[in-house]
Amino acid sequence: MDLSKLQNGSDVRGVALAGVENEPVTLDDAAVRAIAGGFARFLRARLGKESCRVSVGRDSRLSGGAIAETLCETLAACGAEVTDLGLCTTPAMFMTTVTGERPFDAAVMITASHLPWNRNGLKFFTAAGGAESADVREILRLAAEETPFAPGGSVARGEFMETYAAILREKIIAAANGNEKPLAGKHIVVDAGNGAGGFFAERVLAPLGADTAGSRYLDPDGRFPNHVPNPELPEAMDSIREAVLESHADFGVIFDTDVDRAGAVLSNGEELNRNRLIALISAILLREHPGTAIVTDSITSTGLAEFIAAHGGVHRRFRRGYRNVINEALRLNAAGQDCQLAIETSGHAALKENYFLDDGAYLVTRFLMEIAAGRSLESLLEGLYEPVESREFRLKILAEDFRAAGTAVLDSLAEYAKEQPGWSIAPDNCEGVRVNLDKAHGDGWFLLRLSLHDPILPLNIESDREHGARTIARELAPFLAQQTEIDASSALEFTL
């Protein structure tokens, strides 16, 4: 098998279990062994050490245990000192490389985030951070070569989630001036979606005095029987919103499968995801770091940009992909512009104070620090103007070479936009084609971009008036109807 096909940006992803029609297993035992060998060789070259200490963790996926066993055995056979940490979160696995008197040299997290039950994957970490796409390419290249077995390896069992939870608890206690029960009297519910996030209710909130009654789906179950653990999905946010309102909670928290993303709900049922989530953490950080830059992905609203500017911040809209926004934040800091936050509307949030690690639990902890200090989260959102309407369409690219075809469509759109009355191409856009439309032509904007990994052109539309999204779609319809390499039917049907 060509292992390079398992690369998905800075991760490895594949089908790990049979059972879905037309989805043959690609991340099988042989592939895991080869990749483990490639990672061992990669570490030897990168760290300059013959023997490394490596931690291995997994989320609740059904295939996780078997993959972990194979991974640990192979790494040990390559001379590594391996500790299997069992059920963990992705952020916690990175923290094993920077925590304690003897941090691990590297970590591997077994997860496929929010993908279906039959999928799984691998994320790689050292103390320098998560692997880049180029690192994963090199690991898979080395994996295709013969595994370099070496003596001296071992496999042990361990536990880290209590250590990680203690770090989060201490942050909240410090924000409350040392009060050991800073959340006493607060009712906070968690929806873990049967992923790895149940620990947050049991090991963070409850020990700090919070009432967590009404929390949902805390038990790990890799079948994900209740809803997909993905804060971007309406059904997931509906679940935590329902939990908050039914239990009359003060606050609600929802995580994705491996807890590198989060969303939240206020006591009145108002959802904190996408633009609201970014606005809330931006307001907190701009109070603490006036003038700092906030890097976001490309589909944030005009109202969010105005909110960040009104709070004295510098908004840098960048390309989708959590590694992209993190790397842009690192670049800004290196260039002399303080940047405290890299965040996506998907719920990935990486703070400078936390190793620029995208960590959903840490993001929520920052909100709980405000609550513990007696501050109102609702007041922090005052002044955020939100669009009246927003829509997203996913236009399938029909051509085999989808990148070339998608790029050609975007190039054509950029030229087309220049000739349209009431249209203006956004000057601060770094991905796809973003066009602002005046009041007579829809009073909003649209963004057409190429998906990071899939043969899709996502189309986002926002308008500041009722029926404005349909007006904008109608403005764009003549162009879309001419594009033979894409299926634009969903957007075109919306115009009817």
Q: Language-model segments: which ranges?
A:
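Proline/glycine-rich low-complexity loops and linkers
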Residues: A76, L85-G86, T90, R141-E170, ...
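Gly/Ser/Thr-enriched, mixed-charge loops and adjacent short helices
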Residues: E101, N118-V244
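Gly/Ser/Thr-rich loops at beta-strand to alpha-helix junctions
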Residues: D59-G65, L115-P116, G193-G198, V259-D260, ...
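An N-terminal, well-structured beta->alpha segment
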Residues: M1-L71, A77, S154-G185
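N-terminal small/polar loop signature for handling phosphorylated ligands or for N-terminal nucleophile
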Residues: R41, R53-R119, R203-V265
